[in-house]
Amino acid sequence: SPAQTQVNAALKRSGEAGNSVPSVDVKGYFASAAADTTTARIGSGTTIILTGNAFIRAKETTDLTAVSGAVAAGGVGAGGSVAVIILNGTTQAEIQGTIRAADTVSISAENTINGSSIQAKVGTAGLIGALGASVAYVDVTGTTGVLIGSGASITSGRNTTVRADLTVKASPVTSGASVGWAAVGLAASRLCVSGTTSILSVQGSSLTAENGNISLTAL
């Protein structure tokens, strides 16, 4: 089944089971994929002139909750519990026009991911043998960035700050217990962050701080 295929793929990608990865019959399963886009954009031909500060911010906050559980009992039991979350969205601040502020110019793209309750639980019991597996897997891909286009002009009277920031606070947790004459349990949890955090100032763009500093930070 499609669910079974995804479960087995998650087991392999978890990286915790070595080269020997058992196939798990799905008893409890949770899967979610998100590809949201959050953008703050100053378009080409737009001119903004301010006597104070200029703040342009794209901000995305995602709170994750996933709980999957299974219990199996009998002469020969098999129970598997998998929680899989994949985030591949985009958070971007894009400047294509002109911004001029007498004070500070601040441009930021912020992506915050919170996941304090991501759990895969499994319990099995059998007289002859039992196989229990629990996998909690969170994969953060996607892009967090600031793009300053070729025709963009940014001028501040003081400081100009540009920041792209990806913050991940997620703790996938697995728990498993098996009891029997012969029992095997697999528990694997993994947080994989492979996304891109970047600031791109295209050739032809202009950043100026008349009486201060220019700061570019990608975290």
Where would I find each of the regions flagged by the language model?
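Low-complexity, glycine- and small/polar-enriched segments
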Residues: S1-L219
